[in-house]
Amino acid sequence: MSSSLPILPKSLKDIPRSHNTQNILMPGQLPNDSMPLHQSATQSSISHPRASVVRSSYSAMLGYAANPIDSVSSHEGHFMAAPFISQSSNAEMLQSLCNNNTHGGHTVPTFFPAPACGAPDYMDTITVPDNHTQSGSSTVTSDAAKQNEWWADIMNDDWKDILDATATDSQSKSMAQPSNSAASQPAFNQSTSSHSGDICPVTSPPPNNSNASASKQRMRWTPELHESFVHAVNKLGGSEKATPKGVLKLMKVDGLTIYHVKSHLQKYRTARYKPDLSEGKTQEGKTTDELSLDLKASMDLTEALRLQMEVQKRLHEQLEIQRKLQLRIEEQGKYLQKMFEKQCKSSTQSVQDPSSGDTATPSEPSNSVDKDSEAALDPNRIGDNHPKNSTNVGANLKTAATESPDSPVIATDGSELPQEKRRRVHES
């Protein structure tokens, strides 16, 4: 929004001036019967951001020393505090002042807004003689009507801008943008207004905003309402395929809008995906733990298998040793059994054949040699066989002596004893 100060409108520039003007005075030559049209640019810019309030001194000529000027000054004081006050009363007062001046007076005031800040003050006074008062009254009334229309145009066009701006903002904008005044002149000329007292109403928020705010009111989701919502979502194929419009149609709840369903559906989706993510993390943690446990278990199993193989090897070695020992024991048992059988046979033969002693005597040395060899092999049986052999020899000698006393006796060592000695032995 550009704020600029209006300049003299075209309607005022085109007003025909009277040819009977006596003199046109400069600001330094202002007489007593003329009216200054512009008094202070700074005061007018403070009171209104776009158009200055016209101040005129009619007190000396027209007799309005107290009422009109005081009312204008009081309105100016109120403009500083409250810039949003209606200015219809000022417009009516200015119109009445212009009408009074044209009917009974000597001068015709030309109204135009104040120039931009920094421009030199100027005034333009046109004096009209008494005899031309009636002829110029029509031009003055038309001029006043155009002025009123121009003032109403300013109020109608810029009233919203005045409501939005503050007093300080208006001062800064009017001082900073004097060059935009020429560009804003066509906008004032194009607008038309019939009544100067019309004021634009204060803007209020559109009804659409109120409806939107009413539709976006918070709603408490009860467990029953949430269950119906979940049921509708499941009917539509899950939270991904469900749409707020379809859920709203299926729920059929009074006071429930599509905004409520949309927000609740978004929350439902996020709340549903969060446990899945947490479950995925827990599953990943479980898999890592299981892998570590599997590695540990496999290592333990390999170690146990290795120990088991070592134990089995040792057992096999021990079994081989035991088998070899058993074979040796069996061989020794067989050998001992053979020796025992031979001893039994020799003893039975000596007992059953006593008459074969003579024949057995020459074979005794051979038997004794065999027995000596067996005793060498088995020393445990030496003591057992020796007494048996001695008894057998003694018995053989007695039988031989009884049977043949005259036969020479053969000693055990193979030497023959003399006969005398045998007799002595026999007698004794």
Swiss-Prot record:
Keyword Cytoplasm: no
GO MF entries: DNA binding; DNA-binding transcription factor activity
Keyword terms, alphabetized: DNA-binding, Nucleus, Transcription, Transcription regulation
Region (Disordered): 1-32, 168-219, 345-428
Principal location listed in the UniProt entry: nucleus
Keyword tRNA processing assigned: no
Positions with biased composition (Polar residues): 345-368, 388-405
DNA-binding region: 244-269
Boundaries of every HTH myb-type domain copy: 213-273
Cellular compartment(s): Nucleus
InterPro entries xrefs: Homeodomain-like_sf, Myb_CC_LHEQLE, Myb_dom, Myb_dom_plants, PHR1-like, SANT/Myb
GO cellular component: nucleus
Bias (Low complexity) ranges: 1-10, 176-191
Role: Transcription factor involved in phosphate starvation signaling. Binds to P1BS, an imperfect palindromic sequence 5'-GNATATNC-3', to promote the expression of inorganic phosphate (Pi) starvation-responsive genes. Functionally redundant with PHR2 and PHR3 in regulating Pi starvation response and Pi homeostasis.
NCBIfam families per the UniProt record, alphabetical: myb_SHAQKYF
Protein name per the record: Protein PHOSPHATE STARVATION RESPONSE 1
UniProt lineage: Eukaryota, Viridiplantae, Streptophyta, Embryophyta, Tracheophyta
